[in-house]
Amino acid sequence: MKVPVRELKPALTNAIGLTGGDTPSMINGVYVVNSKAGLKLYATDRVTAIENRIEPTVEPAVEFEYFLDREAVELLSKMALNRAVTFTPDGVSSQNIEIKPADENFPKTVIELIDNAWKDAWLELPKVEGWDIGYNPALLKHIKDVVIIPHPNGFNQARLIAPGLRGLTMAKKVKHGS
């Protein structure tokens, strides 16, 4: 799948802002999934998980998935906006640059958590009594136009939405009267 860097840049910026520092190597990067639904880039820092979606092109979709480490993601984000990047089952390429997938096993539970948070069953989680729920906006400041949608029952997860992005973040519980 061929994608202009201009379209890819917001997703790469979101992932770079979320990962790094003391993040374990198996999640310090982006998990790439290509299917008929389009190209999806997953990232997490153990508190927040995001899915960026790049719309499918007219090319027939070849299904593949792999992990790109943070160095690869940073290299892609520094490319000129007018360049095109090609995602294939063997890795990512753009003109004379080739990036091979990293040898890491991204935890698939991240994808399941995001999918579950965006299903209506999420609303059936039990009401939490005796706690105030808060979110640290500093953890999400790098995501442009992000909206936090708190759980209506006070559960400790909130949905995240931004252009081309969906995800969830964990809350910080504060006992009443603390």
Regions found by a protein language model. Name each.
Residues 1-178:
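DNA polymerase processivity clamps
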